[in-house]
Amino acid sequence: MAKEKIIGIDLGTTNSVVSVIEGGQPIILENPEGQRTTPSVVAFKNSDIIVGGAAKRQAVTNPNVVQSIKSKMGTTSKVNLEGKDYSPEQISAEILRYMKNYAEAKLGQKVTKAVITVPAYFNDAQRKATKDAGTIAGLQVERIINEPTAAALAYGLDKQDKEETILVYDLGGGTFDVSILAIGGGSFDVIATSGNNKLGGDNFDEEIIKWLLGKIKAEYNIDLSKEKMALQRLKDEAEKAKINLSSQLEVEINLPFIAMNESGPISFATTLTRSEFNKITKHLVDLTIQPVKDALSAAKKTPSEINEVLLVGGSTRIPAVQELVKSLLNKEPNRSINPDEVVAMGAAVQGGVLAGEVTDILLLDVTPLSLGIETMGGVMTKLIERNTTIPAKRTQIFSTATDNQPAVDINVLQGERAMAADNKSLGQFQLTGIQPAPRGVPQIEVTFEIDANGIVSVSAKDKNTNEEKTITISNSGNLSEAEVERMIKEAQENAANDEVKKKNIELKNKAENYINIIENSLLQAGDKISAEQKEQSQKMVDEIKELVKNENYEALEQKMAELEQAMAQAAEFANKQNESDPNNNSSEQNN
């Protein structure tokens, strides 16, 4: 019987993450939607309880949706849902129960124990409420630990021999926290905290939404600020644009059939540059300055006395935020671990310590299987082929997939399949600090080396900056000979199918996205379009649904091409009608 795991949970204001120790290292467990982070949102609908992304998607249309319940923990406030009062602990318990359940499904075993993280500033009542939420969810909470402590654990800073002062800059979806820790001899002491519990990534999204509403109003004289369906689509596009602007200098925002006017459907498209994004969100970035200064003052430290700066929270990916941190503290921040996941990983490390699972290196059995990395499009690129005699060393040059990409994620793989997802992941790390350049220009030197003892070292080096990161792996996953043979056989049998699979999945996702857009547009349009137009649109939707259902990808590809052409023509017609409408022009001039 497998030893019971102690999972680590980052119960966040906006998103939550669950991690567990596997082979001595923390891994993130994906939720049923295939996502590594789960929105901390709970919805009630006809007595059904919905958690995560499905609940978040109802936020605009369902009044019985609860978000950011973490801010109410430790208070006596209640939330009334479908006529019944619920405490913050009960709502948080639904999030924890959801994560517990999918952790059990992923691990294939019962999960009853957890380490849960809380902000360093949480008082006793808030900490007890968090523990109570875990108990309600059916979890024995082994430890409540501070989020900055968890981040330091994930970075391995507990192994430092000397005493150091660490600043953790945590800008999440809904809150901002700064913590300063004294670390030494395996102990962590939070010596100062500061922050703003009403500042986070959601605020950046809102600024993009306001910018988009203004652009649509100026171009079409239509106010969508009260249109729930349109606002939900604007929010989705704003969040995507914000994320993409962390690695791109500009993004295209396309909103087909976002509204209707006398001329017909309106398809809106615009470009948001990183420069414009920085301009409309500068006041938000600047709001993080004073809390950093306050924390330094409370800790009686100067920037030069800070040994390490850790970035936590997805919003720290924003380049302007990173630049601000660097200028404030005169130090390049450490962002080598995914900022969305680092706290949960630290909680898992603590759980691993309590369960006696944590070791210094990732253990894995060296087997006659190929070793490589995941490259663009989710493909596995092999560096050391199976049956290579050890010791062995192989080096290959790779590059970036997008313009001005600041970092590359190295996913170390073992197996014979063409697609990365079908192989075994042995470990992951990130090479950061890549200087802005067009895609394909930076030279990233990846080296695999296996010594006589079967210890695998994987390094990635930026040849321009000489920045380098390394992961050490030993004993490739405890694979038996039978498992090795099975993996080789599967690779041979699926070689052709692997190449087709990715293309079909992408096509299906694209089709389902268009179906959703058209159906929402028809619903929003109401009586603004003719019955004939509705019938034609619905007929096309039904045809696409049938093709998706029957997995007729060849016909689906042709139908999607026809749909895209029709949408482009509709958008062009609507824009021409708008340009030639004198009433619209005069109304714009009067605004």
UniProtKB/Swiss-Prot annotation:
PROSITE patterns (UniProt xref): HSP70_1, HSP70_2, HSP70_3
Q: Which superkingdom does the taxonomy of this entry point to?
A: Bacteria
- Coiled-coil annotated residue ranges, if any: none
One Pfam family of this chain: HSP70
Polar residues biased stretches: 580-591
Q: Where is the composition biased (Low complexity)?
A: 568-577
For this UniProt entry, which residues form the secretion signal? Answer: none
Q: Which SUPFAM superfamilies match?
A: Actin-like ATPase domain, Heat shock protein 70kD (HSP70), peptide-binding domain
Q: What induces it?
A: By stress conditions e.g. heat shock.
Q: Name one GO molecular function term.
A: ATP binding
Gene3D superfamilies in UniProt:
3.30.420.40, Actin, Chain A, domain 4, Substrate Binding Domain Of DNAk, Chain A, domain 1
Positions of region (Disordered): 568-591
Phosphothreonine modifications at = T175
State the UniProt keywords alphabetically. Answer: ATP-binding, Chaperone, Nucleotide-binding, Phosphoprotein, Stress response
PANTHER family from the UniProt entry? HEAT SHOCK PROTEIN 70KDA
| UniProt family annotation | Belongs to the heat shock protein 70 family.
In UniProt terms, what function does this protein have?
Acts as a chaperone.
Protein name (record): Chaperone protein DnaK
**Source organism of this protein record:** Mycoplasma mycoides subsp. mycoides SC (strain CCUG 32753 / NCTC 10114 / PG1)
